[in-house]
Regions:
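Active-site-proximal alpha-helix that buttresses catalytic centers in soluble enzyme cores
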Residues: 1-241
Length: 241
């Protein structure tokens, strides 16, 4: 039984899920965040209010914050870094959300490895011991945090899955996704991404095709139907801390 199941119900809070979004085409991702907030709401105790916004959509963050009191901010990001450590706090301050409380981002939530393992195992068509897992992730040319969180996820998945090999591959840094896919040859590709944006729809399939990797590319983990419940659990836990 999870720790949050032992805790008394948290007092009603306001909350906001925030993602980076897509600056070139912000509207679709903005809609996804609002839908995610709506899907999370039923998992929260009565009285909670939750909204979603992206940083990329002009005015969206300010509009989402309007009327919220001391909201919990849920960063829908896969790692700590510039966006969670610098840009998001700055944008919150500029919006006047001085009482907002930012919590751990999605990619570092302790329950995420179990979901990743369950999703990957459900996609296997052979014994796990003969199956490879390729974790497709963003990476960064300037920061180690994205890679570090991906390697930590790979390490957490090893005992949970029993896969033959688990390799991370990155879009923006070495070891690049195509190289890791080529090294594995076959298996399952699970994108360690929050949203289904350009890297997921274009870069990952291109790298897999270039490598001749045999196996399915699963939807990004952030789009799994169980994610709203994970977000709600994280918010409830943060409110009761």
């Amino acid at each position: 039984m999870r720790a949050e199941e032992h805790a008394p119900p948290a007092a009603p809070r306001d909350a906001l899920i925030v993602a980076h979004g897509a600056p070139a085409d912000p509207a679709p991702q903005e809609s996804v965040l609002q839908a995610l907030a709506a899907a999370t709401a039923p998992h929260l105790p009565p009285g909670w209010r939750i909204r979603g916004a992206t940083l990329a959509a002009e005015g969206a963050l300010d509009a989402a914050l309007d009327g919220l009191h001391a909201p919990l901010i849920y960063p829908f990001f896969m790692a700590e870094g510039f966006f969670t450590g610098t840009l998001l706090p700055r944008r919150l301050a500029e919006a006047g959300a001085t009482e907002a409380e930012q919590i751990t981002p999605f990619g570092l939530y302790p329950a995420l490895p179990a979901l990743m393992a369950r999703v990957a195992l459900a996609a296997t068509t052979a014994a796990p011991a003969s199956t490879n897992l390729l974790i497709a992730a963003h990476g960064s040319k300037v920061s180690r945090t994205s890679a570090d969180s991906t390697y930590a996820m790979a390490a957490a998945l090893a005992p949970l899955t029993g896969f033959a090999r688990i390799l991370p591959g990155f879009v923006e840094e070495a070891p690049f996704l195509a190289d890791q896919a080529r090294a594995l040859g076959h298996g399952i590709c699970l994108p360690f991404f929050a949203l289904e944006a350009g890297h997921v729809t274009d870069d990952i399939p291109d790298a897999i095709k270039e490598a001749g990797f045999a196996g399915p590319i699963l939807p990004p983990i952030g789009q799994h139907p169980d994610v709203p419940a994970l977000i709600a659990a994280a918010l409830i836990r943060a409110a009761g801390a």
